[in-house]
Amino acid sequence: MWLQQRLKGLPGLLSSSWARRLLCLLGLLLLLLWFGGSGARRAAGGLHLLPWSRGEPGAAEPSACLEAATRAWRGLRERGEVVPLGPGVPALVANGFLALDVAANRLWVTPGEREPAVAPDFVPFVQLRPLSALAEAGEAVLLLREGLLRRVRCLQLGSPGPGPVAAGPGPASVSGLAAGSGRDCVLLQEDFLAHRGRPHVYLQRIQLNNPTERVAALQTVGPTAGPAPKAFTSTLEKVGDHQFLLYSGRSPPTPTGLVHLVVVAAKKLVNRLQVAPKTQLDETVLWVVHVSGPINPQVLKSKAAKELKALQDLARKEMLELLDMPAAELLQDHQLLWAQLFSPGVEMKKITDTHTPSGLTVNLTLYYMLSCSPAPLLSPSLSHRERDQMESTLNYEDHCFSGHATMHAENLWPGRLSSVQQILQLSDLWRLTLQKRGCKGLVKVGAPGILQGMVLSFGGLQFTENHLQFQADPDVLHNSYALHGIRYKNDHINLAVLADAEGKPYLHVSVESRGQPVKIYACKAGCLDEPVELTSAPTGHTFSVMVTQPITPLLYISTDLTHLQDLRHTLHLKAILAHDEHMAQQDPGLPFLFWFSVASLITLFHLFLFKLIYNEYCGPGAKPLFRSKEDPSV
């Protein structure tokens, strides 16, 4: 009875405003205590709520696995050495002869230097499909300094169906895969690359780490694990202990009606990969591609047999050579050659406007252009005589790069690329630009020369007969950037445009000696001061930015001291100004029209004010200024 009476009186109690406020306050305190206690339990490793699985069983496990596997990419991404794939970043790996779109699984081959790329109807890579996957998370990036595309997938697998074990586990070490991968998650890492030193070779490295208690099984889909493409015929080649597939076919006709014969040798891969619990698998699939020159379809029947046999012999010979090499050695050789090739470059430090390309845009453009350019200088089959000739061509002080800098040329440094075809067109545009600006010798050398020309063009550097000059526009020095690895004689020069604490630009120059040291001198605009000898000291040398009238280069670098000393007498300058004085003259202030408009508005305002005062005191019906005492209105 007592409880019933209290419950009947509860609505009356809640009708009071102070009671409702007290209940709200108590509820708020309970919520705060609940959240505080749950946070303490999580910090102590106690009981806590499971993460939201988004409707997929175990979805949180692959995400945690992926986070641990890609943690090392963060620092590389900040330095611009790793670029995640996405819109505006095509998944291209290439070496100047082969170009492969990993995302679309397409292949392009460039038969000759001035011939357009052809696209055979051949699926280049093997696709891996997990059996009974419950959840999956993945990410793919371009490793710019290694010249490859890496894709990481974290798989939560169910029990695979019955089937023979097609590939057993191996003791190969999968670096970076085991750490933090998760006990219930299988980690799959794939590397895709077109070998830099072997233009006809591309490969796919498959690394599978299975830390779970069950067998991991993946289905392989591709030409090496299934039937041959429609446009190709395949034969199984057996030489000793080696087996590989040999595909023969033709490319689609070009716009001119010509066709190319294509032969592909591929390492045979089983239809199903299975990895036992607590083991790892490391498998590398190799391909060798050879293509003929353009052939008229009318004479194709008479030439096809002979051409195909020659291409098959070349592909067979190279594939046998590769199968005798350790796969890790082949991959390491590619990475060393690519790092050597990508040592020069452009580093964007500070950008203060919107029309200057970002560091990501510059690095991606350099990567794509290097990928699309052949590098005969890196070929292992190159003779000593040919190598020496190319080295001399690369070190020849041609008149590259003539004209204004390309820093703000948006068609040469595009912020977004949508497809591999657009990259191939951009490569042709860069070649044409460099050839027309005095860089024919560098373009002839291939990828190292093209990279040298791109770095020179970005900052406005030009070689002359006796010196290297930095002729950037003084009006764009508000951006800070550095040009690395400029080849001069036998040394490499690093040139940076930096800003001091007051925002005034200055030049920093350092030298990296290669081989026998050579004395190199430099002087700033006008060369009025005595030239300074550049050394390989880590601190380098700094030069203030001076601007001459008329405009001349901001810096001269030469091995001939007498030439620089004589140069001051041949420039015939009217004046030499500091950079801030030059900018003050270039920007005299607001235009005349602005000040004329302001003066007109002020004049009109005062005229209007004068008119109001005149009408008030001097116009018709105006009140007198002074009133007498006799005025009755006072």
From Swiss-Prot:
Does the record's keyword annotation contain Ubl conjugation? Answer: no
Residues in the Cytoplasmic compartment per record:
611-634
Q: Which residues lie on this side of the membrane: Extracellular?
A: 41-589
Got a GO cellular component term for this one?
A: membrane
**Matching Pfam families:** DUF2152
Question: What keywords is this UniProt entry annotated with?
Answer: Glycoprotein, Membrane, Signal, Transmembrane, Transmembrane helix
The leader peptide range reads 1-40
The protein's superkingdom reads Eukaryota
Q: Which residues are glycosylated?
A: 363
Topology in membrane: Single-pass type I membrane protein
Membrane-traversing stretches: 590-610
According to its UniProt record, where is this protein located? Membrane
InterPro entries in UniProt:
K2013-like
Respond yes or no to whether keyword Transmembrane helix is given for this record. Answer: yes
Q: Quote the PANTHER family the UniProt record gives.
A: SIMILAR TO RIKEN CDNA 2510039O18, UNCHARACTERIZED PROTEIN KIAA2013
Q: What is this protein called?
A: Uncharacterized protein KIAA2013
Q: Species lineage, top-down?
A: Eukaryota, Metazoa, Chordata, Craniata, Vertebrata
